[in-house]
Amino acid sequence: MSEAKTLLVGGLWKNNSALVQLLGLCPLLAVTSTATNALGLGLATTLVLTCTNSAISLSRRWVPAEIRIPIYVMIIAAVVSCVQMLINAYAYGLYQSLGIFIPLIVTNCIVVGRAEAVASKSSVPLSALDGMAIGLGATSVMVVLGSIREIIGNGTIFNGADQLLGPWAKAMHIQVVHFDSPMLLAMLPPGAFIGLGMLLAAKYLIDNKMKQRATLKAESQAQGLPEGKTGAL
């Protein structure tokens, strides 16, 4: 498997920052009350990761090892400030919804961790790819969790998408279920923890199933039997 493919698979699934490393849980749990908020913060985080990884990789030869972390944080803070101004200018409703969690991307362990683990040691293309993969992996978890909570809590999905993507995105708003009494627990912090726990359990089950299939396939190939069968009687 090529290095680029390894980074993609790792960021999106095997080393997913939200479901495997459990990093950045504060914004993940707080902002995912709706799919729109989750998508907005996820895209902002992905943009920050891609830009900061590229900038840090580009300047890694001129950064003294003794002060690299403060310099990384300054680069991250500069990129986050630009992203914050862009959201404020073009998606003000989303900017108000996300609030303090946009500038808090600066302190997100995911961003600093990838800067130290990958960007400071890899080429610019690989660093940018890693940032994009990690960001999209986190975004996918945010959107799935936000969608689950929004459907259970309000019966809708992508309500207010026009605040993020423009007037055309009003068509993305879908009334999935009509509730006489919405389940507010899903929109509150306990609902976020329960939803995340369900996603963690689902990933664990899928990974176990994939390992079992891989083991069975390897045993079948070793014994010269058709795939899915073993020599056991």
UniProtKB/Swiss-Prot annotation:
Membrane-topology annotation of the record: Multi-pass membrane protein
One annotated Gene Ontology cellular component of this protein: plasma membrane
Intracellular or extracellular location(s): Cell inner membrane
Enzyme Commission identifier(s): 7.-.-.-
UniProt superkingdom: Bacteria
Presence of the UniProt keyword Cell membrane in the record: yes
Listed GO biological process terms: electron transport chain
Enzyme class at the top of the EC tree: translocase
UniProt xrefs under InterPro entries: NqrDE/RnfAE, RnfE
Disulfide bonds: none
Coiled-coil ranges (or none): none
HAMAP family per UniProt: RsxE_RnfE
Family indicated by similarity: Belongs to the NqrDE/RnfAE family.
NCBIfam families: PRK12405.1, rnfE
Subunit note: The complex is composed of six subunits: RnfA, RnfB, RnfC, RnfD, RnfE and RnfG.
PANTHER family xrefs: ELECTRON TRANSPORT COMPLEX PROTEIN RNFE, ION-TRANSLOCATING OXIDOREDUCTASE COMPLEX SUBUNIT E
Function summary: Part of a membrane-bound complex that couples electron transfer with translocation of ions across the membrane.
Protein name per the record: Ion-translocating oxidoreductase complex subunit E
Source organism per UniProt: Erwinia tasmaniensis (strain DSM 17950 / CFBP 7177 / CIP 109463 / NCPPB 4357 / Et1/99)
